[in-house]
């Protein structure tokens, strides 16, 4: 199954078990199934300024924000089909979470503001269901795969890194028009822009210059792509996972067994 991952403005959602949400037609909830350390939730239905502690078995829905503390981590599930792990100091926003039944996820849109996530997405119907993840630099599309995504916005050089452990992810700096761009597989030729895109940097109103080059990459098993400022590809290719925290690539903890 194809998986759609949107990387362009990612914020993290953490929910408290004691928090109740009123669900409209089709809205579904996710749940916190593992927690080590601190997890905070900012509920869309209450004040947007106050973070509240979230615990194991807390639920969340669209519009919520989740944030892990220092030396903390959490695992979320969505309709028992997909799971998302949050590394320490990660913030995720749940922008949209819609289902057609108790165990049927139809649409999920998440945004990673800062930090790192690992996710395994299952149970989506090709051409019907949508799972998107975005950061401030790019967007990706997914269906039936395992991947990790990190976003670093602090400092002079913002960066988004996508790693695919198995399956296939399509990522673009113009996720709203993926179906119009010519795709290039990582490890092949460099990313291409759409035939209709404007060549080279273009001056626009204001003090800065922007590039209108647009690209779409296909990232497969054990490949990664790093995106820098302006949505430009910094590097792409295979990666060595020996330094990756085993839990952030799908391994179980002793307490999980």
Where are these regions (language model features)?
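Small-residue helix/turn framework positions
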Residues: 130, 136-139
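Short N-terminal segments immediately surrounding and downstream of signal-peptide cleavage
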Residues: 24-40
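C-terminal interaction modules
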Residues: 2-9, 17-29, 50-56, 69, ...
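Short beta-strand segments and strand-loop junctions that repeat across beta-rich extracellular domains
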Residues: 36-52
